[in-house]
Amino acid sequence: MSNTQLSYKDAGVDIHTGNELVERIKGDVKRTRRSEVMGGLGGFGALCALPTKYKEPILVSGTDGVGTKLRLAIDLKKHDTIGQDLVAMCVNDLIVQGAEPLFFLDYYATGKLDVDVAASVIKGIADGCEMSGCALVGGETAEMPGMYHEGDYDLAGFCVGVVEKSEIIDGTAVKTGDTLIALGSSGAHSNGYSLIRKVLEVSGANPTDLLEGKPLSEHLLAPTKIYVKSILQLIKQTEVHAIAHLTGGGFWENIPRVLPDNTKAVIDESSWQWPAIFNWLQEKGNISRYEMYRTFNCGVGMVIALPEKEVETALALLEQSGEKAWVIGKIEHLGESEAQVEIQ
């Protein structure tokens, strides 16, 4: 038996470094604060009151990560926007049900804590929370020696929002004849990155290669767009029947999640042009059209179903909110043996 006294630091966990990170991020956390939040960082649990404007508040929760986009961000040492990706993946799932995001928590795990990297990531999380009006109320930073390769870390997020019970958007109001409006994406968002990385591998492309005057890395690591404020504004002023967030599974799997069984979405492929990065991926990876629409958003972040009479108002509101929005299709009756999404 050794007489040497061991400490937690000897085992690879530096509590002082963790405390240093907490001090670094306090300002970022503070700027996301909502009036409903009680207390600050450091408690065993975060306290948050329900907004008083809701008569029958229903809580909506979601959790997500950023997939292997994180691998690309780590390899390219681009840590400042991956946090926005994390928030976007959670809050965009909440808003499709009409829920206003209330608070967010993150989980950051690594083998050896690098305060500069972690602070950059959490600043991005705070940026995303600020964009969505959501309070960053806490999180977990886990330093776990032997669990990760040097320089690697993992991220997960958890978000809770609130919606008036009578105003929940669940797709049951969708009717034949409804119009479908698309909201443009900022890129691949946070889905399909295992295929993206495979395309980079087989094509021999370098992230510094230019595409339309910008390095591939800028196209591929463009932060996921957050639609919360523009959609909250839309649902306050128009009648929205359903919203689909195009994430993993693309068009084929996400749109049917919000459609009644007797309806189908007919998408007009000529209504928009794929952003250059998707054409590049399809060409370099020899990816089929079907697989593209199953894996990527192909330039469409959200699809909104609403009555035809609301289209003009909706497009104007979305444009005022800074969204690229257009009519992408319509809802039709689903025939026997037909798929719920038809792209023509």
Swiss-Prot record:
Location(s) in or outside the cell: Cytoplasm
Enzyme Commission numbers on file: 6.3.3.1
Keywords: ATP-binding, Cytoplasm, Ligase, Nucleotide-binding, Purine biosynthesis
Disulfide bonding pattern of the chain: none
Similarity comment text for this entry: Belongs to the AIR synthase family.
Chemical reaction(s) catalysed: 2-formamido-N(1)-(5-O-phospho-beta-D-ribosyl)acetamidine + ATP = 5-amino-1-(5-phospho-beta-D-ribosyl)imidazole + ADP + phosphate + H(+)
Class of enzymatic activity (EC top level): ligase
Protein name: Phosphoribosylformylglycinamidine cyclo-ligase
HAMAP family cross-referenced by the UniProt entry: AIRS
NCBIfam families documented for this protein: purM (TIGR00878)
PANTHER family listed in its UniProt record: TRIFUNCTIONAL PURINE BIOSYNTHETIC PROTEIN ADENOSINE-3, TRIFUNCTIONAL PURINE BIOSYNTHETIC PROTEIN ADENOSINE-3-RELATED
InterPro entries: PurM-like_C_dom, PurM-like_C_sf, PurM-like_N, PurM-like_N_sf, PurM_cligase
Source organism per UniProt: Haemophilus influenzae (strain ATCC 51907 / DSM 11121 / KW20 / Rd)
GO cellular component assignments: cytosol
GO biological process entries: 'de novo' IMP biosynthetic process; adenine biosynthetic process; purine nucleotide biosynthetic process
Source superkingdom: Bacteria
Pathway: Purine metabolism; IMP biosynthesis via de novo pathway; 5-amino-1-(5-phospho-D-ribosyl)imidazole from N(2)-formyl-N(1)-(5-phospho-D-ribosyl)glycinamide: step 2/2
Sample GO molecular function, one term: ATP binding
